[in-house]
Amino acid sequence: DLQVLKPEPELIYGDLRGSVTFDCALGQEMANVAKFLCQLKNGKTCNVVINTLGKKAQDFEGRILLTPKENSHFSVHITGLRKEDAGHYLCGXHPDGEPKEG
């Protein structure tokens, strides 16, 4: 049986030029799959901000760190917060390190 886990959204506040750290938790079956964090745009496309395959969005270069933890968890640390960083982000896992439709 396929189970889709949709955790409750978490609201995170940060100050301009400050920093935030948050955790992402994925199912145990994702332990060996590439992880990613993407920023939702227009409620549809989710642009990868960082992934465990070495990809980083240019806007976040030098400001973001993804730290894998045990049990398919990882933490994300973003510094030098900008107004443009505000928005919705999704944590995920896929062999390509990119979100896939469906």
UniProtKB/Swiss-Prot annotation:
InterPro entries with a match to the protein in the record: CD300_family_receptors, Ig-like_dom_sf, Ig-like_fold, Ig_V-set
Membrane-topology descriptor: Single-pass type I membrane protein
Keyword Membrane set for record: yes
Compartments, as annotated in UniProt: Cell membrane; Secreted
Pfam family, one: V-set
Family matches, as SUPFAM superfamilies: Immunoglobulin
The UniProt record lists the keyword Cell membrane: yes
Swiss-Prot/TrEMBL keywords: Cell membrane, Immunoglobulin domain, Membrane, Repeat, Secreted, Transmembrane
The protein's role, per its UniProt record: Mediates selective transcytosis of polymeric IgA and IgM across mucosal epithelial cells. Binds polymeric IgA and IgM at the basolateral surface of epithelial cells. The complex is then transported across the cell to be secreted at the apical surface. During this process, a cleavage occurs that separates the extracellular (known as the secretory component) from the transmembrane segment. Through its N-linked glycans ensures anchoring of secretory IgA (sIgA) molecules to mucus lining the epithelial surface to neutralize extracellular pathogens.
Record protein name field: Polymeric immunoglobulin receptor
Taxonomic classification: Eukaryota, Metazoa, Chordata, Craniata, Vertebrata
